[in-house]
Amino acid sequence: QFKPDPPFISGLELAGVVLEADPESGFVPGDTVIGGNKTGAFAEIASIPAGGLSRLPSGLSYAQGAAMGAAYSTAYTGLVELCGLTPDQWVLVHGASGGVGLAAVDSAKAMGAKVIAATGINEKRDRISKLYDPDAVILAEGRFREQVAEITDGHLCDIVFDPVGGDVFDES
């Protein structure tokens, strides 16, 4: 864990407008960006290396863009860097109605995986289906292993992504 020496300004993820940029950075003043650094994101003006920035996707507010970093980088790290996700693998995502879970469903689908989204909140099943188009949405309660086996024709899952933990993970 990174522990900066005081005094320092907190904050990891940010979104904003480029005020100044090195000509070789690929950014120009006025560009809207998202990014982060180990500290300083809560400052009114932050100095961030160009490698820590990306363009703010169109249609997103600054708040949405800044929030993407934690959820999507966590999902990417788990799915790709730790589990080696490849297209056509079956991925079971627990906590699919939360921020990191939704990012994992979205990312895995974008990378060509077959995704089963599991949520403990029945009221959120339709929203997950409409917004993120997983291959299936199940309730993560009781013994859901049989549901997964039925959906995957007995294959079960190549990757279980679980930002929740506890009994649900043990069942997986």
Where are these regions (language model features)?
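Mid-domain Rossmann-like dinucleotide-binding core that forms the NAD(H)/NADP(H) cofactor-binding site
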Residues: A66, Y72-G142
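NAD(P)H dinucleotide-binding glycine-rich loop of Rossmann-like/cofactor-binding domains
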Residues: K3, T32-G95, L131
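Terminal peptide-recognition signature
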Residues: A46, A75, A108, I128, ...
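Residue-level recognition of short, solvent-exposed, well-ordered loop/turn junctions
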Residues: V28-P29, T86, H155
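Glycine-rich cofactor phosphate-binding loops and adjacent beta1-alpha1 units
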Residues: I116, A136-S172
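Glycine-rich beta-strand-centered segment in the early N-terminal region that forms part
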Residues: Q1-G40
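NAD(P)H cofactor-binding loop motif with strongest signal on the N-terminal glycine-rich segment
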Residues: A21, G95-A96, V164
